[in-house]
Amino acid sequence: MVRILPIILSALSSKLVASTILHSSIHSVPSGGEIISAEDLKELEISGNSICVDNRCYPKIFEPRHDWQPILPGQELPGGLDIRINMDTGLKEAKLNDEKNVGDNGSHELIVSSEDMKASPGDYEFSSDFKEMRNIIDSNPTLSSQDIARLEDSFDRIMEFAHDYKHGYKIITHEFALLANLSLNENLPLTLRELSTRVITSCLRNNPPVVEFINESFPNFKSKIMAALSNLNDSNHRSSNILIKRYLSILNELPVTSEDLPIYSTVVLQNVYERNNKDKQLQIKVLELISKILKADMYENDDTNLILFKRNAENWSSNLQEWANEFQEMVQNKSIDELHTRTFFDTLYNLKKIFKSDITINKGFLNWLAQQCKARQSNLDNGLQERDTEQDSFDKKLIDSRHLIFGNPMAHRIKNFRDEL
């Protein structure tokens, strides 16, 4: 297991580090106001309806109020609560669901800032569609099922053009604040939020000006998506994985480094990955994002920068070995395509190269690697097909890595010496 460097631990508050590493919030005990330390967590005792640590006890069942309260280690949550990650502390909190948000008639209160409700400056092709959306939202304190149906129809019309290079840029530059608000609004049905995120994703794909606009004009958007991911994953909604995949797709389209995301993001991604273990497509999207973040933090062929990368990686994630295990397993999956094979292998390659013996490689991966070396060497020796230089380069890298990175470097040198004879 790769451990967090002591210098990093000293730079962070013990409360935040503990909440990040242990997947749960460490807060004041309601009755005594004392802080539960990380060591105390090892001695949690559950007795009846209480959880105790060194004679300090709190209820086993979380007792919600109308204001946000911290969720203590080991507590069980009643159904129907609002759950969030506190963006200032990184701690998980819950409160009673405000009855005014969802009425008996299935209406939804939509909280949209006045800034997002402002009409787009200047008319363009989709002004009328978004004007209709704003009128629906602005004229009703709550949204009925009919209102939601009309909003969905508007999204369907816009979706036809969102993938277009010019149209996508116009939509985002005029309407992104509203689209982002609708995508992240927890008071709306998932279907409507999913449509809004789909528009954003369609506009982002293969459209660098859109990527640049969002990245520069809305720098906090990525952190807000991570918080929404956490809340959505905790909701246990049967359709939440669809919206989770949309959120992950947006993050994968934007430039992301570890510094762009909250410190608890690696825990959120691990929880999403584990809870959706039957959804292989979703898990692939999580690993894509992990690969993207680690790659963005890395600078090749510079010892100083490699040291910095190692420090940043350990700071961002305390469980790099666990991610390495997932990459080893996923890269062996026969259902993934060559592009994902390259991406996940390269990530594992870099982790092993930098962290060396701190990253353990299992026998299953080594057996897979041996088989891949044989098959890819055969392809390299085959002169019957037109060469793909990018593919050839990766194949050679994989073959060399068997001994040079994942095995005995001396064996690599001996093999090369024999090949030259």
From Swiss-Prot:
- Provide the protein's localization: Endoplasmic reticulum lumen
Provide the residues annotated with a glycan attachment (glycosylation): 105, 181, 215, 233, 315, 333
Q: Which InterPro entries match?
A: ARM-like, Sil1_fungi
Under the GO molecular function aspect, what terms does this record hold? adenyl-nucleotide exchange factor activity
Which keywords, in A-to-Z order, does the entry hold?
Endoplasmic reticulum, Glycoprotein, Protein transport, Signal, Translocation, Transport
**Which Pfam family would be a valid example here?**
SIL1
GO biological process entries: SRP-dependent cotranslational protein targeting to membrane, translocation
According to the UniProt entry, where does the motif Prevents secretion from ER sit in this chain? 418-421
Induction annotation: By the unfolded protein response (UPR).
Q: How is it modified after translation?
A: N-glycosylated.
Q: Which residues form the signal peptide?
A: 1-19
Subcellular location, principal: endoplasmic reticulum
Q: Name one GO cellular component term.
A: endoplasmic reticulum
Additional notes on this entry: Present with 2420 molecules/cell in log phase SD medium.
According to the record's subunit comment, the protein's assembly and interactions are: Interacts with KAR2.
Which function does this protein serve?
Required for protein translocation and folding in the endoplasmic reticulum (ER). Functions as a nucleotide exchange factor for the ER lumenal chaperone KAR2.
- UniProt record similarity statement: Belongs to the SIL1 family.
How is this protein named in the record? Nucleotide exchange factor SIL1
**From which organism does this entry originate?**
Saccharomyces cerevisiae (strain ATCC 204508 / S288c)
Record lineage: Eukaryota, Fungi, Dikarya, Ascomycota, Saccharomycotina
